[in-house]
Amino acid sequence: ETTPNGFVFASKAHRYITHFKKLRNCDESICSLFNRLEALESKLGPVLFQLPPRWQVNISRLADFLVALPEGHRFAFEFRDKSWLIPQVYDLLANHGIGLCAYDLGGFRSPIVATADFIYIRLHGPKGPYSGSYDGRTLNGWVKRIVSWLRSGRDVYCYFDNDQLGYAAANATTMQQMVERNTPDGVETPAG
C-alpha cells in the first residue's frame, strides 16, 4: 500500500535452489518460495534464479526445472558459468517465456538476448565485482537499448549492484533520468 501504482518487487530465489540443489528436486523449495511471495500479489515482479559459477551447462536439468515453475509469473535466469550462454539455452528459455538476465560483472558482459516479453539487466560493477561507477558513455549505451526495448513494448527491469562504495543509487538515478529524457511521449517508463 505504500508503493506507487505500477511499482513491482523483484525477488531473487534462494541459493539453496540454485547453488546447493542446482535445480534438482526443487518442487518443495519452489512451493515454499511462492508461499512467501504470494503476499506481494500484483506487486510481484520477476523472480531471478542466479546460477553459480563453475557449474557447467545442463540442458536437461534446466528443462525439467522450467516445467516445474508455476505459471503466471515472470522468471529470469542469470548464468555465471559461460558454458550456459549458448543458443540451446536461449531457445529453451524463449520457449517458456523466461528472461535471460543480461549482466555486466567486472569487465565481462553477458550476451544480450531477448527471450521473453521483458528484459532483465543486472549491472554488478564496471571495474570489479560490486564496485566502481558506470560512466556516462556506458550508461548511454544501456539507455539506447532500454529505450528501444520500451518502444517495442517490452518491460525492462534494470538493477545496479555496484554498491560497495555506494555507486548503485547514483547510477540508477542517472540512468532513470536519461531514459526519461530519451523516451518519446506515449511510451511508459517505470517512473511513470
Tell what function each PLM region has:
Residues 1-192:
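Residues lining hydrophobic/aromatic ligand-binding pockets adjacent to catalytic sites
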